[in-house]
């Protein structure tokens, strides 16, 4: 009887540990159009849930008009929950800070970096349920991801593999908690991309940690070159389990 009780307790603890730690919502807001955060301004969402009142269209490509928030150069979005009733999540059109922002269910992408040259700072927060990418990096420059939590995902970060204009992009990842994913990071090493993953990051049931692709500007599907630690994918394996 004691052994059965102990087993039940361990299973219950494991289940609780695997729950996505999204904060409790303080209310809900539905926008008729994207909410624009002006250059240099900060929007504090007060941990309310924000959406667009629409159904996710899966991996069908949306656009800027489908976003919940648009952040202009130097803007900050913080303390917000992005609901499941949206298509494109958040766009940064220049350097931005995304702090303690949570996605309850990713649709096409959670966060798209579309303009400027950074830096783009993602601090805290988290996302779950991404069939493909969580953070899509189309512009150039530096991305810093610190303290983000990601569950049930395709890729946490992907440097655009086939954009019309390509750049050498850099991403640093630390204090990230990753659970049940296909790839943590995807970069285009032939274009000069680099990824640095600190040992403070943990990964449980993540198939690939860092994948190098042959990026292009033709729109073709990029070819996977290699995976694992290298000059471009800078980390020590294995990462610890979460």
UniProtKB/Swiss-Prot annotation:
GO CC terms: extracellular region
Where is this protein chiefly located?
secreted
Task: List the glycosylation sites.
Answer: 216
Signal peptide as annotated in the record: 1-17
Compartment annotation: Secreted
Instruction: Report the function annotation for this chain.
Output: Pectinolytic enzyme consist of four classes of enzymes: pectin lyase, polygalacturonase, pectin methylesterase and rhamnogalacturonase. Among pectinolytic enzymes, pectin lyase is the most important in depolymerization of pectin, since it cleaves internal glycosidic bonds of highly methylated pectins. Favors pectate, the anion, over pectin, the methyl ester.
What protein am I looking at?
A: Probable pectate lyase D
